[in-house]
Design a protein with these regions (language model features):
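N-terminal subdomain of lithium-sensitive/metallo-dependent phosphomonoesterases centered on the IMPase/IPPase/PAP
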Residues: 1-86
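A short, compositionally biased
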Residues: 26, 99, 127-131
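Short, well-ordered turn and helix-capping elements at secondary-structure junctions
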Residues: 35, 68-70, 86-89, 137, ...
């Protein structure tokens, strides 16, 4: 595994521990409503802090763009980590076990490494540019469908109105 992907995996798992603990203790979740069904919680902030700490420990010179903290400039602008510490905050708040930790690394403007971790199911999706994607260490492939009919599509709808 690429060393930077390894750090992303470690960071995602660390954040996942924060999220799972909070999910099992909903009375400790502090919620601020930003808009209709748009929340931020102490869990978002704590998970983000765990990710940032893990990345900065290994790569202090890298930049980070995080959902809650915004941009944290590093001394090497070629490396930029993109973090969504809790994708699915609304589900967490409502007790629905469908959320994930998402981390990507851009190098010179191109996404090179990515991790999506579902801490409830312990499903770890990883991808490296040019090497495909994996689920829990096993290669995954896309279907062969050429038309949208006959496929399964899942999406989330953003809460911000345009």
């Amino acid at each position: 595994m690429h060393p930077m992907l390894n750090i992303a995996v470690r960071a995602a798992r660390n954040a996942g521990q924060v999220v799972v603990k909070a999910f099992s203790q909903p009375e400790n979740i502090e919620v601020i409503q930003k808009g209709s069904n748009d929340f931020v919680t102490n869990v978002d902030r704590d998970a983000e802090a765990a990710i940032i700490h893990t990345i900065k420990k290994s790569y202090p010179e890298h930049s980070i763009v995080a959902e809650e903290s915004g941009e944290i400039a590093g001394t090497n602008p070629d490396y930029q980590w993109i973090i969504d510490p809790l994708d699915g905050t609304t589900n967490l708040v409502k007790g629905i076990p469908h959320f994930a930790v998402s981390i990507a690394l851009r190098v010179k403007g191109k996404t090179e490494q990515a991790v999506v971790y579902d801490p409830i199911r312990d499903e770890l999706f990883t991808a490296t540019r040019g090497s495909g994607a994996q689920l829990n260490g096993y290669r995954i492939r896309v279907g062969k469908a050429k038309e949208l009919s006959g496929t399964i599509l899942a999406t989330g709808f953003p809460f911000k109105q345009k």
